Swiss-Prot record:
Its main location: membrane. This is Phospho-N-acetylmuramoyl-pentapeptide-transferase. Its cofactor is Mg(2+). The gene is mraY. Pfam families: Glycos_transf_4, MraY_sig1.
């Protein structure tokens, strides 16, 4: 919005031209989202406490989690608010990629909100019925994927970028829709599963979003895209603004979510952020890169799949508890140790993922 306004005012004062620079808008997008999160935090926490919107803790979970019962949840609302406001202020409003991310972000946020509401207000520990949750997540993912396929059919926008190989970028055809669907829905659920300890999900999300900000900048720059042998996508540059907004909002939320947490993001935050990372990866044609950079989310999800599969097939569990972060808790690791070590692993994976862009 401000970019559009600046374009009309630049003829009166040349200083408004600074709004056309992507790097400037990326920085102020991050700062805007950060300050909104920091401003909303105390107010959101107080309001959630007043409404008695406290975390519901499973009785079969680690004993250390019982003290978390009643901690305000649904704090993801402040993350989403900060991201949406920042993006609307600093991104070009005509960019279709920006709107794709916002549709998934807000859509998944609404699904998460309904799930949280049923858990917190109606005291239903199961929340939104699983089949309805997946149904609406699928509707949003398939709708966006189909629209993107029609808009980018037989162009670089529907190619598959394979790491470590320079010119291996096959056209996916209709498989693009299927891949996009699984990436968006899968990442949404993966971040949701990871959100089990104070700050555990938000910091890897910040790292991955920061990594994608660099990838989006390169993908939207013809020279750098050619240099790195990745598809040049002219709309991709504005995703830098979205990614930095996620970074800023995430850091602002972490201020209140760090151990011991004053507020939890809830499904309204985790589903939305996961879905956003998924659609960003799809738009940038970097689904494989998401698997590498988001390795913490992948391992958390695989631990649940393996645990359930092993118990059904063999009657035995692989881990003491899944997702895997609970396994380490039950082994006696203090919660802060689990969190920080997962953060370190996440940062390493993001750096490795970025390195693969050059190793071709």
């Amino acid at each position: 919005m401000l970019v559009w306004l600046a374009e009309h005012l630049v003829k009166y004062y040349s200083g408004f031209n600074v709004f056309s620079y992507l790097t400037f808008r990326a920085i102020v997008s991050l700062l805007t989202a950060l300050f909104i999160s920091l401003w909303m935090g105390p107010r959101m926490i107080a309001h959630l406490q007043k409404l008695s919107f406290g975390q519901v803790v499973r009785n079969d979970g680690p004993e250390s989690h019982f003290s978390k019962r009643g901690t305000p949840t649904m704090g993801g609302i402040m993350i989403l608010t900060a991201i949406v406001i920042s993006v609307l202020l600093w991104a070009y409003p005509s960019n279709p990629y920006v709107w794709c991310v916002l549709v998934v972000l807000v859509g998944y946020g609404i699904i998460g909100f309904v799930d949280d509401y049923r858990k917190v207000v109606r005291k239903d520990t199961k929340g939104l019925i699983a089949r309805w949750k997946y149904f609406w997540m699928s509707v949003i993912a398939l709708g966006v994927a189909f629209a993107l396929y029609l808009a980018g059919k037989d162009t670089p926008a529907t190619q598959l970028v394979v790491p470590f190989f320079k010119d291996v970028m096959p056209q996916l055809g209709l498989f693009y829709i299927l891949l996009a669907y699984f990436v968006i829905v899968g990442t949404g659920n993966a971040v949701n599963l990871t959100d089990g300890l104070d700050g555990l999900a938000i910091m890897p999300t910040v790292f991955v979003a920061g990594g994608f900000a660099l990838v989006a900048w390169a993908t939207g720059n013809m020279n750098f895209a050619s240099y790195l042998h990745i598809p040049y996508l002219r709309h991709a540059g504005e995703l830098v603004i979205v990614c930095t907004a996620i970074v800023g909002a995430g850091l602002g939320f972490l201020w209140f979510n760090t151990y011991p947490a004053q507020v939890f993001m809830g499904d309204v935050g985790s589903l939305a952020l996961g879905g956003a990372l998924g659609i960003i990866a799809v738009l940038l044609r970097q689904e494989f890169l998401l698997v590498i950079m988001g390795g913490v989310f992948v391992v958390e999800t695989l631990s649940v799949i393996l645990q359930v599969g092993s118990f059904k097939l063999r009657g035995q569990r692989i881990f003491r508890m899944a997702p895997i972060h609970h396994h380490y808790e039950l082994k006696g690791w203090p919660e802060p140790r689990v969190i920080v070590r997962f953060w370190i692993i996440s940062l390493m994976l993001v750096l490795i993922g970025l390195a693969t862009l050059k190793v071709r």
